[in-house]
Swiss-Prot record:
Subunit structure: Interacts with Spx.
Record carries keyword Transferase: no
Family: Belongs to the SpxH family.
Domain of life of the source: Bacteria
A cellular-component GO term for this protein: cytoplasm
Entry keyword annotation includes Cytoplasm: yes
Pfam families from the UniProt entry: Thioredoxin_5 (PF13743)
Cited function: Adapter protein required for efficient degradation of Spx by ClpXP under non-stress conditions. Interaction with Spx stabilizes Spx and exposes the C-terminus of Spx for recognition and proteolysis by ClpXP.
Record's subcellular location: Cytoplasm
Classification via CDD domains: DsbA_FrnE_like
Protein name listed in UniProt: ClpXP adapter protein SpxH
Alphabetical keyword list: Cytoplasm
Length: 297
């Protein structure tokens, strides 16, 4: 979710602390499940502390091998490594190098698609990414093709014709190359990785690699903001559902820190009011926000 979307979920007004004093960068591979599983943490952090930081997704996928010579950067990163852990990652090399692959390959095409969607705005890019991850991890789509990417564009309500034009455009390619360069400069060796920088300071950044408890992310944010910060009240359940459009009971329970059984009672009330539709996927319950009667499909 970005700043534009946040206004629909009652984000708080600025306090005595400097507004948006921290910049956060989430390094992801859209084909990695760990990057899908960190999203509820990011949503909760944004809802509670979003007035203190901005966030941007950085894609760490594969680059077209025809331009390999232009992707060798060795600029030192002004960053403090807080945690590094090794895990078995899906489709990502952890040797710190930018690897090359044919432009027709799935990782490259998917990365270009995310950048193409982002050309319509950060909110559009985030919606497209979430929809793409739903296809990959909930419907077991291991090799997203052009047809599926166009379906994601349509489902995320972005301009499909504009997306088609941008998918192989120089602008999308340049945006992806910038992400690869930034990934290399930050010495990202594990995904997901979250990097925090103070927006108005030359101090070193803080990087956390891998998935951790929510309190760890809050602790690091507080360390950079350097003043007392308190979480804002979470939005009403209906507002969250409308903003996310499609979310699991487990994710909602985590965000509101409530037992899943209690959350599902509230969700079923909304189902009776025909505001959400329950969809079972892989033994988990997901909830689709119904904007109009025709969405009941």
């Amino acid at each position: 979710m970005d700043k534009q979307e946040a206004k629909h979920i009652n984000m708080p007004s600025p306090s005595a602390c400097e507004h948006k004093s921290v910049e956060a960068y989430l390094f992801i591979d859209p084909l990695c499940k760990d990057c899908w599983e960190i999203e509820p943490f990011i949503i909760k952090l944004w809802l509670e502390y979003g007035k203190y930081f901005s966030i941007r997704h950085i894609v760490t996928g594969k680059v077209d091998g025809t331009n390999a010579s232009s992707h060798k950067w060795n600029k030192p990163a002004n960053i403090r490594f807080v945690w590094e852990k090794t895990t078995s990652l899906q489709g990502f090399s952890c040797d710190g190098k930018v690897h090359m692959q044919e432009a027709s390959s799935t990782p490259y095409l998917v990365s270009m698609a995310i950048k193409a969607a982002e050309l319509q705005g950060r909110k559009a890019g985030s919606k497209f990414l979430r929809k793409l991850q739903e296809y990959i991890f909930l419907e077991n789509v291991s090799n997203p093709d052009c047809e599926l990417l166009l379906a994601c564009a349509k489902d995320s309500n972005i301009d499909v014709e504009e997306f088609k034009k941008d998918l192989h455009s120089a602008s999308a390619k340049k945006a992806f190359q910038c992400d690869l360069k930034f990934t290399n400069e930050m010495h990202i060796t594990e995904i997901p990785s979250l990097v925090f920088f103070h927006a108005n300071s030359d101090e070193e950044g803080i990087k956390i690699a891998g998935n951790y408890s929510y309190d760890v992310y809050v602790q690091l944010l507080k360390e950079l903001v350097k003043c007392e910060i308190e979480p804002e009240p979470l939005p009403p359940l209906e507002v969250l559902l409308e903003a996310t459009q499609f979310i699991s009971s487990k994710e909602v329970a985590f965000i509101y820190d409530c037992p899943q059984q209690e959350i599902e009672r509230e969700l079923k009330k909304l189902q009776l009011k025909r505001k959400v539709q329950m969809i079972e996927v892989k033994c988990e319950r997901y909830w689709k926000w119904i904007a109009k009667e025709k969405d009941l499909v």
